[in-house]
Amino acid sequence: MQQTVIVAMSGGVDSSVVAYLFKKFTNYKVIGLFMKNWEEDSEGGLCSSTKDYEDVERVCLQLDIPYYTVSFAKEYRERVFARFLKEYSLGYTPNPDILCNREIKFDLLQKKVQELGGDYLATGHYCRLNTELQETQLLRGCDPQKDQSYFLSGTPKSALHNVLFPLGEMNKTEVRAIAAQAALPTAEKKDSTGICFIGKRPFKEFLEKFLPNKTGNVIDWDTKEIVGQHQGAHYYTIGQRRGLDLGGSEKPCYVVGKNIEENSIYIVRGEDHPQLYLRELTARELNWFTPPKSGCHCSAKVRYRSPDEACTIDYSSGDEVKVRFSQPVKAVTPGQTIAFYQGDTCLGSGVIDVPMIPSEG
């Protein structure tokens, strides 16, 4: 009996190539599914969903495959955007892409795949799955510049049992070449960057529509002197340099702490200031593909583009771990996701929980 693969299509070149590969080289019945998570200009947000859907339509018509659209705009606002705003209001810096994968793409979209009679869900993520073992393992994509396992690290492994990542073994150059050879309408379309609902506008400009400006003090961590004013502590993230508007300093200034209750931010001068670095952190909201034992030696990424950092994981409680790095790590940001690896295998992830105000040590 012919099986059905449903391709999550975004209107970009990656998912277009996924649909093409399944249609051209497999016996699967292929269906395209476009997911709309944000209403145009909804609540001040911008999104290119209309143009993206038109591109999905063009690709599917060329490939002669059926296609559908589903709107999760309401659920996205409730399960991703609302949390995004709440975390920012509390001083954290969440990653909405990781939230979207967990709450929408590999939950609600999975259910839609089942409704449509799909056997598999295929996406254009640059990562791999090892299904040969008893437990599904998430692996890095073979292209280190495009590896997206970090963004999948917060997704429950139970949600990946029927997922296919055909681009995991490829690099972007190969994908572009396939798209060009197949004359896909999206072959030369630029990759999307940034957060969907923010669009091309400055991040602060978007955020202040929901978290109003509130003037507060900028405090020099070393001297404890007030050196300037800011428009809201929640707009700033640990390690941030841009947007401080502090003149008269020979060295660059960086945010090292925030006091949300007092609406103050703390800065240090110089990119190598010791307060910018941490040797350990706590991670909460753990999600494991391959649960490590306490004392496990592995590596970790504290943000998407950060290098792997050697570390040790120790369980401090059932839902938290203590992470100790071999070398001090710069600009560790509360609210961001830390993903753990052993070689190419992603062990899982947690949410970084470090003090908003650094210690005096």
UniProtKB/Swiss-Prot annotation:
Region entry Interaction with target base in tRNA, spans: 95-97
Record's keyword annotation contains GTP-binding: no
InterPro entries cross-referenced by the UniProt entry: MnmA-like (IPR004506), MnmA-like_C (IPR046885), MnmA-like_central (IPR046884), MnmA-like_central_sf (IPR023382), Rossmann-like_a/b/a_fold (IPR014729)
Residues at the active site: 100 (nucleophile), 196 (cysteine persulfide intermediate)
Catalysed reaction, written as an equation: S-sulfanyl-L-cysteinyl-[protein] + uridine(34) in tRNA + AH2 + ATP = 2-thiouridine(34) in tRNA + L-cysteinyl-[protein] + A + AMP + diphosphate + H(+)
Cysteines joined through disulfide linkages: 100-196
Residues under site feature: Interaction with tRNA: 125, 336
Main location: cytoplasm
EC number(s) given by UniProt: 2.8.1.13
The name this protein goes by in its record: tRNA-specific 2-thiouridylase MnmA
Transmembrane annotation, as ranges: none
CC annotations in GO: cytoplasm
Native species: Chlamydia pneumoniae (Chlamydophila pneumoniae)
